[in-house]
Amino acid sequence: MADINLKGMGVALITPFKEDESVDYEALGKLVDYQVQNGTDYLVVLGTTAETPTLTEEEKKNIISLVVTRVRGRIPIVLGVGGNCTRSVVEKLKTDNFEGIDAILSVVPYYNKPSQEGIYQHYKAIANATHLPIVLYNVPGRTGVNMTAETTLRIAREFDNVIAVKEASGNITQMDDIIKNKPARFNVISGDDGITFPLMTLGAVGVISVIGNAFPREFSRMVRLALAGDYDSARTIHHSFTELFSLLFVDGNPAGAKSMLNMMGFIENKLRLPLVPTRIVTYEKIREVLRQLSIKC
């Protein structure tokens, strides 16, 4: 198993689309460069923010190839590999080409709402199917089921290649329970930009960020300051983004992030159905906040 450190700010990359809704690979390449050059510690490819369920298998392969080629080993790449059919996920892990991939992010099975034992058995099968480091992903607002602290810790203790959990349950008490009782080699990563700072004061090691798509330099600085224990300086940056945290998700993710990147000139403001762009009122509110942050748009 490769030695990988996912402390700091990872960015869950969006997938840019052209006006005809084809993937804008040129824009994606520029976004990757923007991330690498502005302090992002690692990239997460084909996660929720990438609109992955709307992508074809060919598009997914092309995106992975582009990101790996563009990054050139400068920062780690984490690939989203998950699903609600354990057998299919295991088969994918055994047969796909993972050259250039440093770890995988695997979401709790969604829709079919497994029990805690089912979640454990799912991740056991995944851990036994790959040599790659695994980041668990708990996001009950999307999956319909919460992976409890007890289950998370059970998996963390039993499988050495399970190295972290991306926690997006919104339950600070649950996250703190994991932080207090986890193995030393296992880390908790925030899955929510808005609670990253408070969670890091409890011992989380960073975030897989959405807002970092637009603000990699600023948000990664906040994370580094928090890791260094400079909570006063980190708090100041956190507070500067407070209004934007909520605005980005008013009309769903990644609609808010794409609105920001559109205003900043990176991408077309296109999503694939069933997702749609932010409402005009939300778009204008985001624009006003960006102006207050002195971002040209």
Curated annotation (Swiss-Prot):
Record-linked NCBIfam families: dapA
Localization: Cytoplasm
A GO MF term: 4-hydroxy-tetrahydrodipicolinate synthase activity
Chain positions recorded as pyruvate binding sites: T49, I208
Root EC class: lyase
Protein family according to the UniProt entry: Belongs to the DapA family.
Designated name of the protein: 4-hydroxy-tetrahydrodipicolinate synthase
Keywords assigned by UniProt, alphabetized: Amino-acid biosynthesis, Cytoplasm, Diaminopimelate biosynthesis, Lyase, Lysine biosynthesis, Schiff base
Site (Part of a proton relay during catalysis): T48, Y111
Stored HAMAP family: DapA
Gene name tied to this protein: dapA
Pathways per UniProt: Amino-acid biosynthesis; L-lysine biosynthesis via DAP pathway; (S)-tetrahydrodipicolinate from L-aspartate: step 3/4
Active site: Y137 (proton donor/acceptor), K166 (schiff-base intermediate with substrate)
Pfam families per record: DHDPS
Subunit and interaction comment: Homotetramer; dimer of dimers.
GO cellular component, one term: cytosol
Any one biological process term the GO annotation gives: lysine biosynthetic process via diaminopimelate
E.C. designation(s): 4.3.3.7
Function: Catalyzes the condensation of (S)-aspartate-beta-semialdehyde [(S)-ASA] and pyruvate to 4-hydroxy-tetrahydrodipicolinate (HTPA).
Catalytic activity: L-aspartate 4-semialdehyde + pyruvate = (2S,4S)-4-hydroxy-2,3,4,5-tetrahydrodipicolinate + H2O + H(+)
